[in-house]
Regions:
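Pyridoxal 5′-phosphate
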Residues: 1-153
């Protein structure tokens, strides 16, 4: 038996009082439709940027890419051997480049358990960095990131 979330009249539904907010419902439906229309194009753009970043990062001897090739192109996880992730984060922050350490699900751990499961290497899982991309990311930003990263290794 469900209890009402908001008490009041039950002319529309027994679970919520009041009239459904039609303008909000219509606005949400339109926003969802627009997002779904642009999603395939945005996905391909982000995939292209991710591929460029991968191609450039594998050229650097001290870097290991942890994200699998078929993983989401919106997140690229990599490790830099011999450099603490916090040190690199601070160097990059000084250049207005922002990364995260480890993985979102292991931010309080000494190492990333999910990266360890992927790599079976504890050192790599301790030094992982997470680069997030979005539909608003650009190839120019990716090129600038690679340049800044190389200058800070």
């Amino acid at each position: 038996n469900l209890s009402p979330l908001i008490n009041g009249g039950d002319s529309q539904t027994i679970y919520r009082a009041g009239t459904p907010p039609l303008p909000l419902i219509a606005s949400f439906a339109k926003a969802l439709r627009l997002a779904l229309e642009e999603q395939p194009k945005a996905y391909l753009k982000v995939k292209e940027i991710n591929n460029y970043l991968r191609d450039e990062l594998i050229k650097i001897d001290s870097i290991t890419i942890n994200s699998k090739i078929d993983s989401s192109p919106y997140i690229l996880n990599f490790s830099i051997k011999g450099i603490k992730p916090e040190t690199m984060i601070h160097k990059l922050e000084a250049k207005d480049v922002y990364l995260s350490t480890k993985t979102a699900c292991s931010s309080k751990e000494d190492y990333s358990k999910s990266i360890y499961e992927l790599t079976k290497d504890k050192e790599i899982s301790k030094t992982s960095l997470r680069l997030s991309l979005s539909k608003d990311s650009t190839m120019e930003e990716a090129k600038e990131f690679i340049k800044i990263l190389k200058n800070n290794l």
